[in-house]
């Protein structure tokens, strides 16, 4: 909507809904019957995959509207993070983006990788490369508790 892409792509192409609904059902079933390893939960892995997919799709959409790469990076990051925030609002959890593990930074790095390599390799390969970068960084950040430094401001009182 920010770039004038109307109607919203997932409202016209049923393939997105056809992927989202079974994935949601499988995630619910998996969480019910699966005992995750102590440091990495299935919801974290699914969130990393969703962040990777939607960040790259958002950047690709921006580039398809002839927007410049820095804007595509911003749009990709917004798209990737917004989906996770909507999910977090609907569930009683602390939003992943508000936790200290690398989240937005993983999306930024992965989308930058995608925009840099897409001129040199086929589009699908560039998308997969960007998604793998985001997914790998996010999962590594969760598993090894890699944190982004928090900027603290002095209290003026």
Question: Which residues does each PLM region occupy?
Answer:
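Small-residue-rich transmembrane alpha-helices that serve as helix-helix interface/gating elements
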Residues: 127-140
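Cytoplasmic-side transmembrane-helix entry/capping segments in multi-pass membrane proteins
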Residues: 13-20, 38-50, 75, 97-105, ...
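C-terminal ends of transmembrane helices
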Residues: 1, 26-40, 85-95, 141-152
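Short, structured motif recognition centered on aromatic/hydrophobic residues
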Residues: 1-3, 74-78, 82-91, 113
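Alpha-helical transmembrane segments of multipass membrane proteins
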Residues: 25, 29, 61, 81, ...
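Structural signature of hydrophobic alpha-helical transmembrane segments
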Residues: 8-22, 68-80
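Helix-coil boundary and interhelical linker segments in multi-pass alpha-helical membrane proteins
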Residues: 2-12, 57-71, 116-126
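Hydrophobic, membrane-inserted alpha-helices
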Residues: 53-57, 109-115
């Amino acid at each position: 909507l920010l770039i004038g892409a109307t109607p919203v792509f997932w409202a016209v192409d049923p393939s997105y809904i056809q992927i989202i609904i079974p994935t949601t059902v499988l995630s619910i079933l998996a969480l019910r019957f699966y005992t995750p390893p102590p440091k990495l939960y299935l919801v974290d892995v699914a969130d990393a995959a969703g962040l990777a997919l939607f960040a790259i799709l958002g950047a690709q959409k921006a580039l398809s509207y002839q927007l410049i790469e820095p804007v595509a990076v911003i749009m990709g990051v917004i798209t990737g993070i917004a989906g996770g925030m909507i999910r977090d609002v609907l569930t009683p959890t602390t939003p992943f983006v508000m936790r200290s593990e690398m989240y937005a930074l993983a999306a930024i790095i992965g989308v930058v990788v995608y925009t840099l390599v897409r001129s040199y390799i086929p589009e699908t390969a560039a998308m997969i490369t960007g998604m793998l970068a985001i997914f790998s960084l996010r999962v590594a950040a969760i598993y090894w508790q890699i944190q982004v430094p928090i900027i603290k401001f002095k209290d003026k009182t």
